[in-house]
């Protein structure tokens, strides 16, 4: 009787483990993601984005989060990058070099001549490794009008 009870309990536990959903491991985790909007008295606007992202997998490092994309229109907007660096797992800091800021035409505007004035800043994050944290702080300032 005790043996049968033991087997039924073990079978129930195993079935529960199969049926209950499991939490998948994260590719990356945001430690901080802040988007703030400021409307100034002269009518200009500032959108500031601050993010800290820790990478846990090679897929996150090489494909998903290895680059950040910022779309803006230089005819009436200004992009200001306040800070961009990577803190490696051992604590050392790798500043983003100047050649890691690449300005391109957004892919959505490729076949639309009316939108060829748009720009996309591609920030290529350097010094990435498993456990590294990306820090990016930038503003897009829109002129009044």
Report each predicted region and the residues it spans.
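Bacterial N-terminal signal peptides that target proteins for export
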Residues: 1-10
């Amino acid at each position: 009787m005790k043996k049968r009870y033991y087997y039924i309990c073990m079978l129930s536990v195993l079935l529960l483990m199969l049926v209950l959903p499991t939490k998948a491991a994260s590719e990356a985790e945001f430690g901080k993601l802040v988007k703030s909007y400021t409307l100034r008295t002269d009518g200009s606007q500032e959108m500031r984005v601050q993010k800290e992202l820790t990478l846990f997998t090679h897929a996150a490092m090489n494909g998903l989060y290895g680059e950040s994309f910022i779309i803006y229109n230089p005819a009436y907007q200004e992009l200001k990058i306040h800070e961009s660096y990577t803190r490696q797992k051992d604590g050392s800091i790798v500043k983003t070099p100047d050649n890691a800021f690449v300005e391109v035409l957004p892919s959505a505007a490729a076949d639309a001549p009316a939108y060829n004035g748009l720009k996309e800043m591609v920030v290529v994050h350097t010094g990435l490794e498993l456990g590294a944290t990306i820090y990016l702080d930038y503003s897009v300032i829109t002129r009044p009008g």
